[in-house]
Amino acid sequence: MKKMFSVILFLSLFAINVFAQDIVLSGDITSNTTLTANNTYLLNGYVRVQAPAVLTIEAGTKIFGDKSSLGTLIIKPGAKIMAAGTEANPIIFTSVFAKSGSVSTPSYGDWGGIIILGNAKINPAGGTAAIEGPGDSFGGTDDEDNSGVMQYVRIEYPGIALTLNNEINGLTMGGVGRGTTIDHIQVSYSGDDSYEWFGGTVNCKYLIAFRGWDDDFDTDFGYSGKLQYLVALRDPDIADQSSSNGFESDNDGSGTLNEPITSPTWWNVTMIGPKKESGTTINSLYKRGMHLRRSSRNKISNTIIMGWPTGIRLDGANTIQAALNGTMYINNSIVAGYTSTAMDTVSAGGASFNMGDWWTASSGRTFTANTEVALTDPFNLTTPNFLPTSSSPALTGAATPPSDGFFDATANFVGAFGSVDWTAVWADFTPGNYVTSVEENQLSSTPVDFNLSQNYPNPFNPSTKIVYSVAQPSQVKLVVTNILGQVVETLVDEFRSAGTFEVNFNAENLSSGLYIYSLEAGSVSISKKMTLLK
């Protein structure tokens, strides 16, 4: 941790001001490295984690992406990312302009994004390919490949344009194997797709795509993983020049039948498009809730698609033939609030296909107005509530997910939500204004004992002072936890000489409530309560 120290002698007291500064990450990471929550980090250029290195990121860590250098994190095949955030303490990747006091406002494409590359199968000739954007190679033969863990991670304002029509997605997964853990991820304000899978077998749960620019969930190159509990919400004004869709799925760019076939299995998805009601003005580049094309074979169940000009498009003879023979399906799902057509087909070839009959036979339901689906407040762009009300048709007509060790077989409802809002606590629909420093002042060098004083003021909003004393040189840890015992902020985790210290704690990013702050120094452990009241 880089620090600035200034010493001011006044009578018998002196002060040392300590301000956290970003630790710059650049170039290759070639050995095991840990990013800690008591520091902040800046991605400068392409930061590549090379095999066999492991990048560990503590819960609550904030990593900022630099715009001018195209800051991007790339996990190479054979390397790992271990980013296990918690519900109370998610890991945040965001724009450098999202810092409190920044002279610029964070926006789409302020930095690159996160790219995870693995050794699972993909379908281009030769079984390897160069990832779009930086061009690193990925793909192999190991579908069980493990690229690490990403849990409770927010990715904000990614998707920078490298060149015209060449952007990085929010979270890109290329050839990532099913040994990898991906769940509780929120991608917000991506300048390209929120998520894109290029082949691989990785399974994913609890994904949020919020106010993206291009597509929400894009699958290519033979991706065949399992997914459950996904939600997307769009901004009516923002769409991509290439047209914006919810799902976009291709076997490959030419629609060949190269194997493995793009064939992900989706359960419990809610796709909220840009058009809340018939009078809502939307960007003309918005097209479809799902565009399934180029020989892809998606398997979709218990899904809501609402507020899109067209609900579903099946595109291409091979895709339609897959629908006819049952290797591609959309079962027990709802389309609502469409302005052009609920569903259509393109290029059926010689196949005789009636999409309306196919939809009805698959237990599909269609509603003219979004209000008929009776979700609580799904189009709210600052505090959305995707839960169905008691009268919602989403609570009936669902299929039962398989009990296979991955899918939650109790999700007997249509859409991503039943009675539990799994976005609560960790997700943020108004990201930014992050305070990135904790100020610590040494008040005295002659304490008589280890001590932790009551914070002042208390209750507080949003800042308070905490004074502690160290009787002898010690490793000191001062943390803030919630009432569940989960660490929400690490204020100090360093060696301290004997002295009395004052920490100025800014809790701007925490919600109101009771918190515990605890001091561990030497053999002493002291805890006290404080109340944040906003």
Where are these regions (language model features)?
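C-terminal tail/sorting-segment detector
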Residues: K2-K3, T490, E494, A498, ...
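Sec-dependent N-terminal signal peptides
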Residues: M4-F14
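Sec/Tat signal peptide C-region and signal peptidase I cleavage site
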Residues: I16-A20
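Extracellular beta-rich repeat passengers
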Residues: Q21-T56, D66-K80, G85-T86, P90-D192, ...
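Short tyrosine-centred short linear motifs in exposed loops/low-complexity segments
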Residues: A51-A53, Q472-S474, S511
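Glycine-centered coil/turn sites that cap beta-strands in beta-rich domains
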Residues: E439-Y456, F460-V480, F501-E508, A521-V524
